[in-house]
Amino acid sequence: MRSRGKGKRAAALLALAAFACAGGAAARQMQARRVPLTIEVVAPQADALPAAALQDEEKPSVLLYHTHTWEAYEMTEDAQYVPTETWRTRDERFNMLRVGEELARCLRDLGFSVVHDTTAFEPPNLSGAYTRSLAMLEARLAAGETYDYIFDIHRDAYSGLYNGANCVEQDGRRIAYVMLLVGKGTGATGSGFDERPDWPRNLELAQALTDALNAAAPGVSREVKVKSGRFNQHVSTGALLIEVGNNRNTLAEALAACPVIAQALAQVHAARTLQ
């Protein structure tokens, strides 16, 4: 993460935090807007946003990307796509790029500076996707780009751990479960990678986001998962993998989680910056 001065941004960040803390009330005031193929998502009203706007150079910065770019959701009448294989598609209207687009919009509405990398990392083979997404990250950082947060946005695979439930309901909206994943880089045998993430710091961020998510929409976030893989999280502190729903969710349910994630990050960032 970049270090930043606190003084001139305090009022703006407090405004962000106040807006995000009011997540439930703000969500009830959000207006539905139409997106292609009649999938409804929610967008904050302009007059609900913080009045103290951050200057571009002061905005907290986020990089969004998708190592498993073609992951997709359950097809519905309003979300029909041509699959590359089951629950996967090249169609950017229905794969993880659509979720990243929506999350980027929600974050920008809350004052974040967002870069959304839309590179497809799966071709020519899924097994090399993390190597290719790492090359993108290293190239950006070597070019001098800096980010407060680097999020790899995925969707989970449905399993019995979900106990048949995929969503929480809030104000008539079905919101897909979210899960934060932290990589230790130790590897399955303990030998691991030469370069490993500062995973305790990433875990601290993941837990703070999980708590903020569940405060905004009770039960929406599952417990943080810590795994032995690296998931490219060694490139920076503030690097996490975010699972937005699973393959049994609909795209609409995944999109409904994006405003909640954005609100949670605004709250967490304000609290961390003003400490």
Where are the model-predicted features located?
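Loop/turn elements at helix/coil->beta-strand transitions in domains of secreted/extracellular proteins
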Residues: L110-S113, E145-Y149, I175-Y177, V220, ...
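N-terminal catalytic or cofactor-binding beta/alpha core of small enzyme domains
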Residues: A11-D148, D156-A165, L255, P259, ...
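Solvent-exposed coil/turn segments that connect beta secondary-structure elements
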Residues: Y65-W70, H154-D156, G183-G185, G245-N247
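Active-site-adjacent substrate-binding region
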Residues: D198-K225
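A short, glycine/acidic-enriched catalytic loop
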Residues: P83-T86, S159-P197
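N-terminal Lys/Arg-rich, disordered targeting/topogenic segments
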Residues: M1-G7
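Structural recognition of the beta-strand scaffold that forms the well-ordered cores
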Residues: L63-Y65, V114-H116, Y149-D152, M179-L181, ...
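Active-site-adjacent mobile loop/cap segments within catalytic or ligand-binding domains
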Residues: G219-Q275
